Amino acid sequence: MPAIVDVPSGQLVTNDYQRITLDLATEWTALHRPGAPDLYPEPLRAEIDEVMDGIYRDINNGVYKAGFASSQQEYEEAYAALFRRLDLVSARLADRRYLVGDTITEADIRLFTTLVRFDPVYHGHFKCNRNKLTEDPVLWAYARDLYQTPGFGDTVDFDHIKRHYYQVHTGINPTAIVPAGPDLSGWTAPHHREQLGGRPFGDGTPPGPVPEGERVTPPASR
């Protein structure tokens, strides 16, 4: 469970995972770096909230509903809702680079966190297997676009993602065997989404280089 903790006192500040990132974007601006992009612009908040609501219910949480379903009906309902929403999102992104407006917003970040795990984990481990992310041309290009944007792919550790799910969820994967695949080298392939326009960071600037101790090896180099 994500949480913000006051380190000196050890006191929990908040564990409201739905609000933490929004609070960071709106209430903690004094701690933002110079040039930090506005990921939750006030004129677009109603639309962002609406988009995020569907993404959370059917995609972010939907994969877990399918993966931890206790009955066939429960699984099939979650499965259907997941792919119905993914189809809607794919259609929305067919002619626009980002989910809301022409810059990256909180909605894109929340969708990315599930898309980046989809083929390595959710497709097999959670039985969300109608199709792979790589088989949806729009979502696959969109995910690669974000992955190749500073602040996204340079923080993704696919090896850790796979080990976490396959070794921790012993009720689903009792052998704790971690799959060798899938091939992840495609994440660095050209996406051509820049042709749709948009300004990734809006009036802000990209983040600086990842600190040496936090750098992740790109999949193509593994």
Regions found by a protein language model. Give the residues of each.
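C-terminal alpha-helical interaction module
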Residues: 1-222
